Curated annotation (Swiss-Prot):
Residues 398-417 have a biased composition (Low complexity). Residues 101-293 form the Rab-GAP TBC domain. It comes from Homo sapiens (Human). This is TBC1 domain family member 3G. TBC1D3 is encoded by a collection of very similar paralogs with multiple copies of each paralog, some human genomes encoding well over 50 copies depending on ethnic origin of the donor. One of its GO terms (molecular function) is GTPase activator activity. Residues 350-443, 507-526 are annotated as: Disordered. It comes from the Eukaryota. The gene is TBC1D3G. It is found in: Cell membrane. Keywords: Cell membrane, GTPase activation, Lipoprotein, Membrane, Palmitate, Ubl conjugation.
Amino acid sequence: MDVVEVAGSWWAQEREDIIMKYEKGHRAGLPEDKGPKPFRSYNNNVDHLGIVHETELPPLTAREAKQIRREISRKSKWVDMLGDWEKYKSSRKLIDRAYKGMPMNIRGPMWSVLLNIEEMKLKNPGRYQIMKEKGKRSSEHIQRIDRDISGTLRKHMFFRDRYGTKQRELLHILLAYEEYNPEVGYCRDLSHIAALFLLYLPEEDAFWALVQLLASERHSLQGFHSPNGGTVQGLQDQQEHVVATSQPKTMGHQDKKDLCGQCSPLGCLIRILIDGISLGLTLRLWDVYLVEGEQALMPITRIAFKVQQKRLTKTSRCGPWARFCNRFVDTWARDEDTVLKHLRASMKKLTRKQGDLPPPAKPEQGSSASRPVPASRGGKTLCKGDRQAPPGPPARFPRPIWSASPPRAPRSSTPCPGGAVREDTYPVGTQGVPSPALAQGGPQGSWRFLQWNSMPRLPTDLDVEGPWFRHYDFRQSCWVRAISQEDQLAPCWQAEHPAERVRSAFAAPSTDSDQGTPFRARDEQQCAPTSGPCLCGLHLESSQFPPGF
């Protein structure tokens, strides 16, 4: 037998041993895998959430007793909503009650309805069992799954027993999902999410809840776990805009210390929602997230920055986000109703300002292709040959963009000094209407603006190694051409034609006065050796040009 066959047989035997431990049941593993000894009597050691405590719990306080009575009174209202779901599924009353709190004995049926689990089971009869058996035979991550299960919700009475019933169900769900969605496969967060579903749902229902949570457009969690997902980048860009608007000092300090390129709190938001805070607050945040969708993530980020503003402005470059994650957990160490109250207020404020969701994702987001390097904060870059998106509703937060020239149609011919003929052009479909866009027909790479009387002056800080372009590799992909003789004569021609307020391009292609090489050819020669995105032939709209030009 060669090395490959030996390794394959060893791996198959290891997989069978792990599965056998779960099939045998409680305390079937090695001594080091047993973990804490289970409590057989849970009378006075378990709280209302199922968390097992080492010591006997004190009597209920007046506040806790009031909360229990309030939850019982709300149960009938939630039952009425479930009975008439078509009426309440898109109502404001459902959202209001979700922020106030979902009764524990209603949480399972409500999660099932919110994630449309019954419909998924009807469309895929018997598929879960098939995926589970395939996962047992061919899982490549079973060792990681087993290791993560051993540390998932171990203080809860359902998951306290090593290789117990709930841990076995959790193993089956994760193995089945690894086969069901090979793009995501398995990652550590999935064990915590599936465990939360298993607290209130049967095994198969919890599996389809996990499928819907990652696949549905409303929640879009697959972007956090898929290597090709675009959710993270869209939320990251939106977070930078929202925080820069609401907390300019905090974002300014991050820019000054060059902290923006490091880990973002959005990267740990999902972990914070499933681990690190009290189980009661975790469940209430998940209730809101399942009702509201991904737009609930941005208010959570905004609250975190607002609470931690003073600490963040004093944070140095040495491990800022590592300490931020720990302080973010401390932020929620307060009354649950207070946290949800602030979350609701933040949600309303961002919704009013249309900042609860990022702008629509671009086609390149969600693909493995490399993204162009931004020229500045909030600016997006297009490479040569890219086209702008067709006209549609404006983005919620329009940002300056580099764009290609729109198609042109000739308007008239005007004699120019030297016998040349100049054609005044307008964008196609806008004949007779002055446009601030660039007229086509001139040399590729020259920046011309129809509303300007003279050539624009390049800003003094427009340096590929200066603060305007923060990325050092930008100089490999951007080539700024010197102003040609034709551009220098343009103001003289405008002085001779005062009636013509619109800048336009010569019909004949310009050439370099020294070498006689067309600028298009020179652009191709300059861009050929580079590997980054090419910006030759692109222009910036005058209304989007940065201040200081």
